[in-house]
Amino acid sequence: MQTLTVDLGDRSYPIHIGAALLTRADLVLPHLAQKRVMVVTNTTVGPLYLAQLKAALEAAGVRVAEVVLPDGEAYKNWETLNLVFDALLRERAERKTTLIALGGGVIGDMTGFAAACYQRGVPFIQIPTTLLSQVDSSVGGKTGINHPLGKNMIGAFYQPKLVLADAATLGTLPARELSAGLAEVIKYGLIWDVEFLAWLEANMDRLRALDAEAISHAIYRSCEIKAQVVAEDEREGGLRAILNLGHTFGHAIETGMGYGAWLHGEAVAAGMVLAAETSQRLGWLGEADVARTRALIRAAGLPDVAPNLGVDAYLEYMGHDKKVEGGKMRFVLLKKLGEAVITDAVPADVLTAVLTPPH
């Protein structure tokens, strides 16, 4: 097992990364305010992992309640969130009752948001079971739900007490979901660490084959970069926005196609290609850099061509982006591979050219 710390002063918390951590109640117990939890999971992950987590906690004397939600991005909304509140109220959950998110990014985001809201804030723990949630969404305290007009538009910054990333759960992950997670891993190389990017190019086959050593390294390095960025800028006042490479375009793809049609990682992958092409048109990246980005995204089994929503639709959806400031869209682009920049100075003709097929 490897451990990282997200350094946020008295709200710091550990990220434990390893195999067979799901049954390690000894890792969970120190972070419980009372021996009482509510596990939030979904209809896919619950049948696979809920029983063993519950048994381990109950054997340690913890009272465990559960709520099982429908699976999918299409359910990341108020109606589903209310099912969590219904369960908490039925169980008479208290302010010291800990919520445990057992699932991927949707479950983690909704559980964290429920924890931030219920009785104005109860503790929660992240047990991410997808690669995307293990390397990205479980770390850093972004929680929330979608709105028909925009992804993740309703939410809160609310940090977990613990992140438990059990790489063994990736064994049941469909190949498409694994690839979606690799998009966020690639993102860290593009924005922060060109050596990690080169390592990903050399090891993509191992990662897709779930080679234990390769997967552990990818999770650790991704979390290490994210923890460093979040520690410097928890609430996305500046630096943290670089973690959104590909997300301005990607969120527009998800909204425009209908939540769940494209997985988040797939939309981000295509969005990162659009960001690379924009960076090239601004004179920052060379043609070879864009080709290298595309090739790695394809090697991960991800789309490198964005859907044709039409320029106007893209601009409409991107106008709802959370990085918009003073009515101006702000983009995360690449000064070079391994170095991101945030800018609002993207000329309209450049955007139009990038968003007009063929890409």
Curated annotation (Swiss-Prot):
Note accompanying the cofactor annotation: Binds 1 divalent metal cation per subunit. Can use either Co(2+) or Zn(2+).
Pathway field: Metabolic intermediate biosynthesis; chorismate biosynthesis; chorismate from D-erythrose 4-phosphate and phosphoenolpyruvate: step 2/7
Molecular function terms, GO-annotated: 3-dehydroquinate synthase activity; metal ion binding; nucleotide binding
Domain of life of the organism encoding this protein: Bacteria
Keywords linked to the UniProt accession: Amino-acid biosynthesis, Aromatic amino acid biosynthesis, Cobalt, Cytoplasm, Lyase, Metal-binding, NAD, Nucleotide-binding, Zinc
One GO term (biological process): chorismate biosynthetic process
Entry binding sites for Zn(2+): 184, 247, 264
Subcellular location: Cytoplasm
Catalysed conversion reaction: 7-phospho-2-dehydro-3-deoxy-D-arabino-heptonate = 3-dehydroquinate + phosphate
Cofactors required: Co(2+); Zn(2+); NAD(+)
Binding residue positions for NAD(+): 71-76, 105-109, 129-130, 142, 151, 169-172
Protein task: Catalyzes the conversion of 3-deoxy-D-arabino-heptulosonate 7-phosphate (DAHP) to dehydroquinate (DHQ).
Full protein name: 3-dehydroquinate synthase
